[in-house]
Protein backbone atom coordinates (compact mmCIF):
# COMPACT_ATOMS: atom_id res chain seq x y z
CA UNK A 1 0.00 0.00 0.00
CA UNK A 2 1.12 3.54 -0.78
CA UNK A 3 -0.04 6.44 1.39
CA UNK A 4 0.57 9.96 0.12
CA UNK A 5 -0.37 13.12 1.98
CA UNK A 6 -0.33 16.05 -0.41
CA UNK A 7 -1.86 19.39 -1.22
CA UNK A 8 -3.70 18.59 -4.41
CA UNK A 9 -6.67 19.20 -6.65
CA UNK A 10 -8.62 16.41 -8.33
CA UNK A 11 -10.59 16.36 -11.57
CA UNK A 12 -12.82 13.47 -12.60
CA UNK A 13 -13.37 13.15 -16.34
CA UNK A 14 -15.89 10.57 -17.53
CA UNK A 15 -19.66 10.22 -17.66
CA UNK A 16 -19.74 13.61 -15.96
CA UNK A 17 -17.14 16.01 -14.64
CA UNK A 18 -16.33 16.79 -11.02
CA UNK A 19 -13.68 18.96 -9.40
CA UNK A 20 -12.09 18.99 -5.95
CA UNK A 21 -10.25 22.28 -5.34
CA UNK A 22 -6.74 22.48 -3.93
CA UNK A 23 -6.51 21.17 -0.34
CA UNK A 24 -4.50 18.79 1.84
CA UNK A 25 -5.67 15.20 1.30
CA UNK A 26 -4.67 11.57 1.70
CA UNK A 27 -4.08 9.63 -1.53
CA UNK A 28 -4.30 5.87 -1.07
CA UNK A 29 -2.96 3.43 -3.67
CA UNK A 30 -3.70 -0.22 -2.87
CA UNK A 31 -2.01 -3.36 -4.15
CA UNK A 32 -5.06 -4.21 -6.27
CA UNK A 33 -4.49 -0.98 -8.22
CA UNK A 34 -7.35 1.03 -6.74
CA UNK A 35 -6.78 4.71 -6.00
CA UNK A 36 -8.85 6.74 -3.54
CA UNK A 37 -8.74 10.32 -2.28
CA UNK A 38 -9.63 11.03 1.35
CA UNK A 39 -10.25 14.11 3.50
CA UNK A 40 -9.99 14.26 7.30
CA UNK A 41 -13.69 13.48 7.73
CA UNK A 42 -16.40 11.30 6.11
CA UNK A 43 -15.32 8.27 8.18
CA UNK A 44 -14.21 5.57 5.72
CA UNK A 45 -15.75 7.07 2.57
CA UNK A 46 -13.37 8.61 0.01
CA UNK A 47 -14.06 11.90 -1.74
CA UNK A 48 -13.37 10.20 -5.05
CA UNK A 49 -11.91 6.91 -6.18
CA UNK A 50 -11.14 4.60 -9.10
CA UNK A 51 -11.63 0.86 -8.74
CA UNK A 52 -9.47 -1.75 -10.48
CA UNK A 53 -8.61 -2.56 -13.16
CA UNK A 54 -7.05 0.85 -13.72
CA UNK A 55 -3.63 2.34 -14.41
CA UNK A 56 -1.74 5.06 -12.55
CA UNK A 57 0.61 7.23 -14.59
CA UNK A 58 2.80 9.75 -12.78
CA UNK A 59 3.85 12.62 -15.01
CA UNK A 60 4.13 16.42 -14.89
CA UNK A 61 2.40 19.32 -16.56
CA UNK A 62 3.30 22.94 -16.93
CA UNK A 63 1.56 25.43 -14.68
CA UNK A 64 0.09 28.08 -16.97
CA UNK A 65 0.78 31.06 -14.72
CA UNK A 66 4.34 30.28 -13.63
CA UNK A 67 5.54 27.88 -16.30
CA UNK A 68 6.67 25.53 -13.54
CA UNK A 69 6.35 21.76 -14.02
CA UNK A 70 4.24 20.21 -11.27
CA UNK A 71 3.42 16.54 -10.57
CA UNK A 72 0.29 15.10 -12.17
CA UNK A 73 -1.22 11.69 -11.51
CA UNK A 74 -3.50 10.27 -14.20
CA UNK A 75 -5.62 7.32 -13.06
CA UNK A 76 -7.58 5.71 -15.90
CA UNK A 77 -9.87 2.70 -16.12
CA UNK A 78 -10.81 0.55 -19.12
CA UNK A 79 -13.78 2.79 -19.92
CA UNK A 80 -11.47 5.78 -20.38
CA UNK A 81 -12.69 7.52 -17.22
CA UNK A 82 -9.93 9.48 -15.51
CA UNK A 83 -8.94 10.96 -12.20
CA UNK A 84 -6.40 13.73 -12.78
CA UNK A 85 -4.63 14.59 -9.52
CA UNK A 86 -2.51 17.75 -9.57
CA UNK A 87 -0.04 17.84 -6.68
CA UNK A 88 1.01 21.28 -5.48
CA UNK A 89 2.96 20.12 -2.41
CA UNK A 90 4.02 16.67 -1.23
CA UNK A 91 3.98 16.27 2.56
CA UNK A 92 4.53 12.53 2.91
CA UNK A 93 4.96 9.51 0.62
CA UNK A 94 5.08 6.10 2.28
CA UNK A 95 5.02 2.52 0.99
CA UNK A 96 4.14 -0.44 3.18
CA UNK A 97 3.49 -4.08 2.26
CA UNK A 98 0.56 -5.24 4.36
CA UNK A 99 0.73 -8.78 2.99
CA UNK A 100 -2.26 -11.01 2.37
CA UNK A 101 -5.22 -10.21 4.58
CA UNK A 102 -6.89 -13.20 6.29
CA UNK A 103 -10.29 -11.54 5.89
CA UNK A 104 -12.94 -10.65 8.42
CA UNK A 105 -13.33 -13.28 11.11
CA UNK A 106 -16.89 -13.58 12.31
CA UNK A 107 -17.55 -13.96 16.01
CA UNK A 108 -19.05 -17.17 17.34
CA UNK A 109 -22.65 -16.01 17.20
CA UNK A 110 -22.41 -14.74 13.61
CA UNK A 111 -20.69 -17.92 12.45
CA UNK A 112 -23.36 -20.03 14.14
CA UNK A 113 -26.15 -17.90 12.67
CA UNK A 114 -24.67 -18.48 9.22
CA UNK A 115 -24.50 -22.23 9.83
CA UNK A 116 -28.06 -22.42 11.16
CA UNK A 117 -29.54 -20.30 8.39
CA UNK A 118 -27.75 -22.37 5.76
CA UNK A 119 -29.18 -25.55 7.29
CA UNK A 120 -32.70 -24.08 7.31
CA UNK A 121 -32.51 -21.79 4.29
CA UNK A 122 -36.23 -22.26 3.62
CA UNK A 123 -36.90 -19.96 6.59
CA UNK A 124 -36.12 -17.06 4.23
CA UNK A 125 -39.10 -18.14 2.16
CA UNK A 126 -40.85 -21.18 0.74
CA UNK A 127 -38.88 -22.77 -2.06
CA UNK A 128 -35.50 -21.26 -1.12
CA UNK A 129 -32.49 -23.54 -1.70
CA UNK A 130 -28.85 -23.23 -0.66
CA UNK A 131 -26.14 -22.79 -3.30
CA UNK A 132 -23.24 -22.53 -0.83
CA UNK A 133 -21.88 -20.79 2.23
CA UNK A 134 -18.93 -18.41 1.95
CA UNK A 135 -19.44 -17.85 -1.78
CA UNK A 136 -16.14 -16.36 -3.04
CA UNK A 137 -15.83 -12.93 -4.68
CA UNK A 138 -12.74 -10.80 -5.43
CA UNK A 139 -13.49 -8.67 -2.34
CA UNK A 140 -14.28 -11.45 0.09
CA UNK A 141 -16.83 -14.23 0.59
CA UNK A 142 -20.58 -13.70 0.65
CA UNK A 143 -22.02 -15.35 3.76
CA UNK A 144 -24.68 -17.31 1.88
CA UNK A 145 -25.65 -17.59 -1.77
CA UNK A 146 -29.04 -19.19 -2.35
CA UNK A 147 -31.92 -19.29 -4.82
CA UNK A 148 -35.51 -18.23 -4.27
CA UNK A 149 -38.63 -20.13 -5.29
CA UNK A 150 -38.33 -18.79 -8.85
CA UNK A 151 -34.69 -19.79 -9.21
CA UNK A 152 -33.34 -16.27 -8.78
CA UNK A 153 -29.97 -15.74 -7.09
CA UNK A 154 -29.99 -14.24 -3.59
CA UNK A 155 -26.93 -13.05 -1.63
CA UNK A 156 -27.30 -13.02 2.16
CA UNK A 157 -25.11 -10.98 4.53
CA UNK A 158 -25.38 -11.98 8.21
CA UNK A 159 -24.53 -9.80 11.20
CA UNK A 160 -25.20 -9.95 14.91
CA UNK A 161 -25.87 -6.19 14.97
CA UNK A 162 -26.69 -4.85 11.53
CA UNK A 163 -25.32 -1.38 10.81
CA UNK A 164 -24.68 0.75 7.76
CA UNK A 165 -21.26 -0.87 7.25
CA UNK A 166 -22.95 -4.23 6.72
CA UNK A 167 -25.36 -2.80 4.15
CA UNK A 168 -22.46 -1.17 2.30
CA UNK A 169 -20.59 -4.48 2.35
CA UNK A 170 -23.56 -6.35 0.90
CA UNK A 171 -24.03 -3.62 -1.72
CA UNK A 172 -20.45 -4.12 -2.90
CA UNK A 173 -21.01 -7.88 -3.15
CA UNK A 174 -24.21 -7.34 -5.15
CA UNK A 175 -22.45 -4.97 -7.54
CA UNK A 176 -19.86 -7.65 -8.31
CA UNK A 177 -22.24 -10.62 -8.43
CA UNK A 178 -24.60 -8.83 -10.81
CA UNK A 179 -21.76 -8.62 -13.34
CA UNK A 180 -21.82 -12.44 -13.59
CA UNK A 181 -24.23 -13.41 -16.36
CA UNK A 182 -24.67 -16.86 -14.80
CA UNK A 183 -25.97 -15.36 -11.54
CA UNK A 184 -27.61 -12.05 -12.47
CA UNK A 185 -29.94 -10.67 -11.42
CA UNK A 186 -28.88 -11.15 -7.80
CA UNK A 187 -31.14 -9.92 -4.99
CA UNK A 188 -29.89 -9.09 -1.50
CA UNK A 189 -30.98 -10.05 2.02
CA UNK A 190 -29.49 -8.30 5.07
CA UNK A 191 -30.00 -10.54 8.09
CA UNK A 192 -29.14 -9.69 11.70
CA UNK A 193 -30.32 -10.16 15.27
CA UNK A 194 -30.80 -6.41 15.47
CA UNK A 195 -30.85 -3.99 12.53
CA UNK A 196 -30.27 -0.31 13.24
CA UNK A 197 -32.93 2.04 11.84
CA UNK A 198 -30.47 3.90 9.60
CA UNK A 199 -29.19 0.60 8.19
CA UNK A 200 -32.73 -0.61 7.51
CA UNK A 201 -33.58 2.62 5.71
CA UNK A 202 -30.45 2.42 3.56
CA UNK A 203 -31.01 -1.25 2.75
CA UNK A 204 -34.63 -0.80 1.77
CA UNK A 205 -33.72 2.24 -0.34
CA UNK A 206 -31.34 -0.02 -2.28
CA UNK A 207 -33.91 -2.78 -2.71
CA UNK A 208 -32.31 -5.05 -0.11
CA UNK A 209 -34.69 -7.08 2.06
CA UNK A 210 -34.11 -6.95 5.83
CA UNK A 211 -34.60 -10.03 8.01
CA UNK A 212 -34.43 -9.95 11.81
CA UNK A 213 -33.00 -13.22 13.16
CA UNK A 214 -33.95 -14.80 16.48
CA UNK A 215 -30.89 -16.81 17.52
CA UNK A 216 -32.74 -18.91 20.08
CA UNK A 217 -35.55 -19.65 17.66
CA UNK A 218 -33.10 -20.71 14.97
CA UNK A 219 -31.52 -23.12 17.45
CA UNK A 220 -34.96 -24.60 18.05
CA UNK A 221 -35.35 -23.38 21.63
CA UNK A 222 -38.66 -21.62 20.97
CA UNK A 223 -39.67 -22.19 17.34
CA UNK A 224 -38.14 -22.64 13.90
CA UNK A 225 -39.61 -19.47 12.42
CA UNK A 226 -37.91 -16.16 11.70
CA UNK A 227 -39.53 -12.81 12.19
CA UNK A 228 -39.54 -11.06 8.83
CA UNK A 229 -39.87 -7.28 8.60
Swiss-Prot record:
**Keywords tagged on the record:** Cytoplasm, DNA-binding, Endonuclease, Hydrolase, Nuclease
The entry's cellular-component GO terms read: cytoplasm
Question: Which molecular-function annotation in GO is an example for this chain?
Answer: single-stranded DNA endodeoxyribonuclease activity
A matching Pfam family: NucS_N
Q: What class of enzyme is it?
A: hydrolase
- The keyword Lyase is annotated on this UniProt entry: no
The compartments listed are: Cytoplasm
Give the source's domain of life in one word. Bacteria
This enzyme's EC code(s) = 3.1.-.-
User: Where's it mainly located?
Assistant: cytoplasm
Has UniProt tagged this entry with the keyword Hydrolase?
A: yes
Identify the HAMAP family for this entry: NucS
Q: What does this protein do?
A: Cleaves both 3' and 5' ssDNA extremities of branched DNA structures.
Family from the record: Belongs to the NucS endonuclease family.
Name by which UniProt lists this protein: Endonuclease NucS
Gene transcribed to yield this protein: nucS
Amino acid sequence: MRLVIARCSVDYIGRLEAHLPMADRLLMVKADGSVSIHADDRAYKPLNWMTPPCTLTETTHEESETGESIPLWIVENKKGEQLRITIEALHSDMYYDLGEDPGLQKDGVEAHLQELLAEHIETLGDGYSLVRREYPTPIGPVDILCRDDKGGSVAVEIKRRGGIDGVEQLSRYLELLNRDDLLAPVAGVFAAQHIKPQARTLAEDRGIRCVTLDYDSLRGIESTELRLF
